[in-house]
């Protein structure tokens, strides 16, 4: 799925462009696409991009709950222009969950924009705060025909090394102050039908885990 937006701004020099790590929030403008690919009006896959190229993804469930730990593999590119900023998004179908069918189907759809300096948020399909629900207020995307999905398999191997300096006797011919340690492992995801995904790690790299 390809998506894009041109977000006009009369003061492009004031666009908030804080550079953030993956899934960070911070002080930044944002554009997002929300896809209810089951069209159950309860589940949504959200993809956010900022003017600086920062990316966030999340899973909405039970209409109003959010899971920020959900991670997808997708791409985006953003550029600041003289009259605002623009962005393009590429979302592989393998990252979404949907019911394959040769017949035309409907998805829930919404677009979101955040202008940080005004604290302003806007939606293509209005989200009324006085109404209960979030995904259930999405608009409708029609005319989708999608074939059966291939088995979803994602493999992300890693290799890491560390150089540990250790004191010792410099006159010892076998002494080396460098103690190089290597490590390797792999993360994987295997799709089990359209509703389930098996996620696992072999020899996890705890050095890359953020401290809470």
Predicted region positions:
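Structural preference for beta-rich elements and adjacent junctions enriched in aromatics
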Residues: 1-212
């Amino acid at each position: 799925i390809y998506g894009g937006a041109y977000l006009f701004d009369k003061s492009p020099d004031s666009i908030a462009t804080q550079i953030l790590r993956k899934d960070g929030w911070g002080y930044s403008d944002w554009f997002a696409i929300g896809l209810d690919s089951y069209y159950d009006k309860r589940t949504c896959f959200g993809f956010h991009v900022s003017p600086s190229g920062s990316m966030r993804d999340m899973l909405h469930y039970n209409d109003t709950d959010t899971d920020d730990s959900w991670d997808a593999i997708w791409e985006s590119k953003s550029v600041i222009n003289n009259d605002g900023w623009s962005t393009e998004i590429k979302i592989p179908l393998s990252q979404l969950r949907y019911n394959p069918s040769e017949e035309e189907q409907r998805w829930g759809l919404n677009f979101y924009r955040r202008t940080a300096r005004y604290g302003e948020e806007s939606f293509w399909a209005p989200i009324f705060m006085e109404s209960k629900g979030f995904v259930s207020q999405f608009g409708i995307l029609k005319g989708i025909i999608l074939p059966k999905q291939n088995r979803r398999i994602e493999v992300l191997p890693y290799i890491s090394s560390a150089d540990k300096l250790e004191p010792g006797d410099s006159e010892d011919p076998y002494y080396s102050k460098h103690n190089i340690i290597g490590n390797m492992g792999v993360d994987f995801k295997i799709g089990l039908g359209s509703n389930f995904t098996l996620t696992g790690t072999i020899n996890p790299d705890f050095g890359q885990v953020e401290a809470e």
